[in-house]
Amino acid sequence: MPKRLPEYAVRNREVWTVSNANYTAASATESWAQDEITWGRWHTPESEIKVLPQLRGLEVIELGCGTAYFGAWLKKHGARRVLGVDITPAQLDTAREMNEKFGLGLEFLKANAEAVPLPDESFDMAFSEYGASLWCDPDLWIPEAARLLRPGGELVFMRSTDLEMVCSADTERIGTQLVRPLKGMHRLDWTDDEVGASTEFHVSHSELFQILRRAGFDVLDFRELYATEDAVDHPYYQYVTAEWGSQWPSEEIWRAKKSRRRPGAPAARRRAKKT
């Protein structure tokens, strides 16, 4: 990992050190013990939405892995190798403890997902569930994911929806009114009395689509998720209620494939057939 992290990464590392002590370390055993893959705060089953590629035999890098419970699920469902990358030592300590306890053979690397010290084209799939997809600059981490993927490899990530972000006030729970512009959003600096100051990144769908295309990705799938019928408010991440999430999508999943052609190169022209 480079000696100097961006200032927002330093703040986010401090926030996740506190969050690990307050919640994620205590919840890690239950998450790692789970066999079913579920998505986000509403635990939407992968068996219902079927957005992941076939995992059997894949080498996967999780960018912003936290305690790496999702990486554990990927390994249980057939991934040959899973490497988790994160900048927060406390989160990685918890992940290593869980890995030893459950014996799944995950690997871990302390590094910034915007600049991972690994060779080009090392993985078949890059993944992030509220990791790099939320806490890193998309203009940096998405091209980095592309660099790490082999041609034809896939990027799958979950983040907040446009609607959630424009309805989220600085200090209150989400509401039903637009409180901030989507245009020019990109970076949001938050202050929380419990965990401290943090920085998230969010760009609109059209901007994100262009970032993916510039990095050499073709978008394969896109899903917006609502709270499930039996969903309840999350015990720790309480800024979005189940009631709100049952009416409007609060989470979204993107799946993209690294093109086998050079980023920015035009597709081969086809000769017109004579009639």
PLM regions and their residue ranges:
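N-terminal, positively charged/glycine-rich alpha-helical extensions of SAM-dependent methyltransferases
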Residues: 1-31
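Conserved alpha-helix/loop element of class I SAM-dependent methyltransferases that forms part
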Residues: 31-58
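Class I SAM-dependent methyltransferase SAM/SAH-binding core
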Residues: 61-115
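A short acidic, Gly/Pro-enriched loop at the edge of an enzyme's catalytic core
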Residues: 114-125
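A short SAM/SAH-binding and catalytic strip from SAM-dependent methyltransferases
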Residues: 125-139
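A short glycine-rich, Lys/Arg-flanked "PGG" loop and its adjoining helix->strand segment in the class I
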Residues: 139-154
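Conserved class I S-adenosyl-L-methionine
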Residues: 154-188
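Short alpha-helix
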Residues: 199-222
